[in-house]
């Protein structure tokens, strides 16, 4: 891992603006501080300029020549960040931060941790580092599971699980075996502990900064005290959603698969 920098949303927005991408910068700033008037925005940017100077990111020589007043390596970093065409996004419901991994070029990727929509930390990594980066980010328990557990749901039942009050309806439209009912109860207990929300790892393709990113793949999962529940889509005709309690080893295999899929975009 090759650390790049840590900055605030305002600092990142100014760096992106100076690099010629005001539209992208606007989105970064508004995600942190909300919509502002032009006068308020100018005041924020003036203060932020002083912060960039203090951090020695500002290049007076470049400014005196009428060029972008940023060090060359910072300009290269911003260009890679804004123009990245592939991104892995790792949600973390239990924390106030999120991990994103942007593809830069060839086997070079960049981790991007956003803390409370305010602090941004960046580092360059290799594609082969992606599985371990994600594994360490989540740091799920390595305790072994007591027994195999799984159940199947229809697409409708899976969608209904986003709301606690739909449990009875999910049971009504599902045909659980006694073993699946027991697994479903265990899953619901873990879902309750996680605020009734699943985690996910998503792969996005962003062919143009003028367009919204395209979701290419997504995996849903949920940590348990022992093991990790993983959602998998199958070719079952009526209940294609399979929810299975994975061992930590299976979780690591899944992340290796994420790494392999990421490596395929290098070519």
Label each PLM-derived region with a short phrase.
Residues 1-53, 59-73:
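Short, amphipathic alpha-helical interface elements at domain boundaries
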Residues 2-5, 28-30, 64-267:
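Non-catalytic recognition/regulatory regions in large multidomain proteins
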Residues 19, 55-56, 81, 258:
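Generic structural signal for hydrophobic core residues of well-folded globular domains
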């Amino acid at each position: 891992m090759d650390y790049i920098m840590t900055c605030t949303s305002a600092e990142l927005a100014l760096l992106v603006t100076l690099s010629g991408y005001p539209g992208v910068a606007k989105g970064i700033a508004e995600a942190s501080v909300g919509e502002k008037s032009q006068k308020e925005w100018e005041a924020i940017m003036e203060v932020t300029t002083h912060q960039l100077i203090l951090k020695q990111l500002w290049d007076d020589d470049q400014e005196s020549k009428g060029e972008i007043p940023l060090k060359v390596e910072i300009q290269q970093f911003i260009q890679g960040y804004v123009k990245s065409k592939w991104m892995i996004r790792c949600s973390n419901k239990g924390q106030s931060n999120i991990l994103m991994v942007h593809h830069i070029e060839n086997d070079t990727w960049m981790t991007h941790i956003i803390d409370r929509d305010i602090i941004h930390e960046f580092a360059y990594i290799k594609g082969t580092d992606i599985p371990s980066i994600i594994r360490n980010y989540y740091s799920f328990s390595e305790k072994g599971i007591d027994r195999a557990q799984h159940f199947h749901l229809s697409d409708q039942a899976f969608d209904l699980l986003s709301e606690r009050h739909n449990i009875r309806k999910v049971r009504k439209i599902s045909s659980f075996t006694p073993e699946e009912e027991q697994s479903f109860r265990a899953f619901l207990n873990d879902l309750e502990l996680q605020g009734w929300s699943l985690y996910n790892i998503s792969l996005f393709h962003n062919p143009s900064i003028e367009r919204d990113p395209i979701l290419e793949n997504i995996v849903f999962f949920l940590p348990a005290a022992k093991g990790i529940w993983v959602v998998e889509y199958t070719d079952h005709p009526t209940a294609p959603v399979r929810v299975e309690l994975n061992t930590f080893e299976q979780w690591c295999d899944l992340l290796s698969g994420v790494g392999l899929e990421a490596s395929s975009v290098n070519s």
